[in-house]
C-alpha cells in the first residue's frame, strides 16, 4: 500500500549559483558519505549530483508529509546508490519500501519518492 508520494524539481543553474555563492551550502545538504562521493566528481557532475540529492531529499520529506524544516533536515535523509547505481534512501524503516528516481536534463534535476508500506 502506498503511504506517501513526493516529487521535486530544481534548476541546475540555481544550485550551481548557491554552490558558488555559499561554501556551506554543500555541507547543509549532503551527509558526510554523500560528500565523499561528491568531491570525486567533475565540476559539471557535482552540480548534477547536488541538485539530484537536493530534489530527492525534498521529495522524500514531502512523501513523509513533513517537508524539510524543524522535524526533518537534509542530514536526516541520506541518498546513496545500490550496486547497480539505483538511488536508495538509507533508512532504518523496516516496515516500508522506499522507491527513489532521480533524473537530469540540461537545465533541471527532478526526483520522485514513493513510500510503500510492506505489512
UniProtKB/Swiss-Prot annotation:
Pfam families: ACPS (PF01648). It is found in: Cytoplasm. Its cofactor is Mg(2+). The keyword Magnesium applies. The gene is acpS. Its EC number is 2.7.8.7. Belongs to the P-Pant transferase superfamily. AcpS family. GO terms for molecular function: holo-[acyl-carrier-protein] synthase activity; magnesium ion binding. Keywords: Cytoplasm, Fatty acid biosynthesis, Fatty acid metabolism, Lipid biosynthesis, Lipid metabolism, Magnesium, Metal-binding, Transferase. The lineage of its organism: Bacteria, Bacillati, Bacillota, Bacilli, Bacillales. This is Holo-[acyl-carrier-protein] synthase. Mg(2+) binds at residues 8, 58. Signal peptide: none annotated.
